[in-house]
Amino acid sequence: MSTPSPLTRDGFIQAQDAIAQAAEEKAAQRQHAKKKLTARERLSLFFDDGVWHEVGQFIGGSVRAGRIGSAVAAGYGRVQGRMVAAYAQDFSVLGGTLGKVEGDKIVDLIDRGIRMRIPIVGIQDSGGARIQEGVVALAQYGRIFKKTCEASGLVPQISIILGPCAGGAVYQPALTDFIVMTRENSHMFVTGPDVVAATTGEKVTLDELGGAAIHNFQSGVAHHMADTEEEAIDYVRSLLDYLPSSCEVAPPKYEYIPNPEDEAAARAVAELVPTSVRQPYDVRDVVRSLVDHGEYVEIQDLFAPNVTIGFACVDGQSVGIVANQPMNDAGTLDVDASEKAARFVRFCDAFGLPIVTFVDVPGYRPGTEQEQAGIIRRGAKVIVAYANATVPMVTVILRKAYGGAYIVMGSKSIGADLAFAWPDAQIAVMGAEGAASIMYRRELAAARENGTFEEMKAELVARYEEETVNPEVSVSSGQLDGIIAPADTRQTIIDSLHLLATKDQRAPHVKRHDNGPL
């Protein structure tokens, strides 16, 4: 398009605005035809009231030549009143591919986020490295990876995948704290379908290789699957409500006014948990009954559902929640659930979020599949996470806690500051039936021969439950800080968090880093 020449100051501003408007109209035509928003529409939707300040819009472009800049839009704005840095790849410009200019803009934005100590959000929609720029484009990925690692644990980083994210580009979102995808248009993979077919002979579709369902249900790469772009962006805004701007400031604390609904839900929480340890229930209902306004933002709800993790507020204090889920695989721990819980605990610890753990676990999932999948190495990650955490940690045993799984689920011996149990909780090396079968093998064998097996087993199981699996043993030995009535659970958690508010969260030893089982 033509621009005033020579450009006066007023003419320059007018030309700049005209070029930007023309570029956005072109982007809208291309993206809307695919039922996708433009990069700048996405950022406007993300920031409060659509207000944000773009930086470097014409880097790599030319106002005189009538050409807008790179395939990345970047800037700053407020989310729920707090400053956040964000960028969005622009697929309407050279397929959103990344070259030197795009890499420089992303690195610069992350670097500013680090210096300003504010969260960083990246919206991915790119064809990958710009082939024409060769190794220069690849080197930019290395710079982005390094800068993302530098920001990790310092400021929250969230990725939203709203288009393709392929090749080496996938590792930048993987280095961030949370990844959100949309059901239809989001794809992440290291090698595309054509390369897979050429090298292995396997024919797969984009969805089969790296669609949102794959990464939310199976791989665990993603943390949430939204139906629309708007829902994905809104979910990220909700996440940020619970997170501090950086590790150097306290997590959000909101004014909470007690209300009859929360009080009634807390009093009735026992009704949600069956007394039989074999009967399933949805532990998320328990969580919602104990947190403010029943609001619980779950993370990775589709992956490893035998453990649930997420954020909530208790008396206005933002906390991380970890809980076994009896609705799925009886709440057992397996390789996926272990890694899911471990990384979440590490995140909470990095950003000073207190951790509330609800335990109802029968043990680790048995079988050759789990052993071959590395349950020893991968299960140990939960130990590392809880044992190294220095944030306030409160644990409540709801119904059962058996064996090694009890120990790793935020027990007092592994680092919980305060641990409680409901009166009917069973805490032991294993369940009563299994223990009785081992401890009284000979007696039961004799009873089987004389026809009194069932009566004998029932008697031995009852004896074991009375003498061993009740929480009194744990209280008397100091493994629990108290047995509480279910109706008092919420208030107990509130009182515990108030007590732990001044906890010294400094690491006990100075060292480079631990060498846990990554």
Positions of the model-derived regions?
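Ligand-binding clefts of soluble mixed alpha/beta catalytic domains
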Residues: 1-518
